[in-house]
Amino acid sequence: MARTAATKLALVPLVAAMLLVAADAHHLRPGELCLGPLRRLRKRQRHQPSAGCCSGVKRLAGLARSTADKQATCRCLKSVPARTTPAGPQASPPGAASASPTRSAPVSTALRSTDRTRAPHISSDRRLVG
């Protein structure tokens, strides 16, 4: 009887630690970021984003909470070719989708500031970068 009580007391912190790790283990993956509606918006040169675009932007704003999630989101958004960058009303689908951005700076500035959080590294021409 004493052994089972001791075993239970030893297992409770272990299970609690496992639950905390499992809760923190979910990070955004590139597959979770659906940029298709944004690309279609840019190609059609529409003034209003589609419902799919708005829901994707709102979902993305809700999912990117940790620094790692925000960095993954920035990397994904940076991977979109520059030639599809919208102009005019399409330039800010988050605003049109009523999603509040977490920063007031332009996206390019916000992305540059997250790049600075990386550790310095040596570039191909042997200069210290970072």
Swiss-Prot record:
The keyword Signal applies. Residues 84-110 have a biased composition (Low complexity). Keywords: Signal. This is Protein BLT4. Residues 1-25 form the signal peptide. GO terms for biological process: lipid transport. The gene is BLT4. Possible dehydrative stress responsive protein. Not shown to have lipid transfer activity. Residues 80-130 are annotated as: Disordered. Induction: By low temperature and drought. Shoot meristem. Pfam families: Tryp_alpha_amyl. Residues 113-130 have a biased composition (Basic and acidic residues). It comes from the Eukaryota. Belongs to the plant LTP family. GO terms for molecular function: lipid binding.
